[in-house]
Amino acid sequence: DYIIELNKKGTFFVEGFAALLLRRILTPFATGFVDLQSPAGVGIAGVIYDYDGSVYVSDEARMMARFKNYYFRLGNVNENSYQEMFNGELLHHIISFACTECLPACSDCVFQPYCGADPVRNMSEQGDMVGFRPTNEMCKKTKSIIHYLFELLHKHDPEINRIFWSWLN
């Protein structure tokens, strides 16, 4: 409400996460934010190369390795081939947990088309790649924001709609 009011009073201020969600809701265009796509972008939209040549599915996976969790390490450029890392069983397995259409509580969620499921985040926060939606903080946050955005869109308020579209352009 505060950010909407700022915009109504003439201060252009974009709420970044809401803008990403609105782009998913109001347009056919991708956001480029790999956490809000299905499958999630881990290992397929980008990877992280570490100083020692290790290749991780995401920066979060690289950070987990700092705590001795190497599960999301695809290999090492000095030891493994491209095929081994990017067409190997590990990446295929990880991606199988990155599709909201296949995950419990995501596949039948009304907001599923606007979300993503990050197996790295789930492993880090909940101990497995699926995660448990009722206690998943990212899920709770995203669903509550999407619900709020739909409430505002449902009002058909021309001023709010103008603000939302200004965030997308």
State what each model feature region is.
Residues 1-28, 61-107:
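C-terminal accessory region of radical SAM enzymes
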Residues 10, 63-64, 72, 77, ...:
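Radical SAM enzyme core and accessory elements
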Residues 25-38:
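Short, electropositive alpha-helical surface patch
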Residues 40-43:
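Short, small/polar residue-rich loop motifs at catalytic or cofactor-binding pockets
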Residues 50:
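Short, acidic, Ser/Thr-enriched surface-loop or helix-capping motifs
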Residues 58:
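Short acidic/histidine-rich active-site segments
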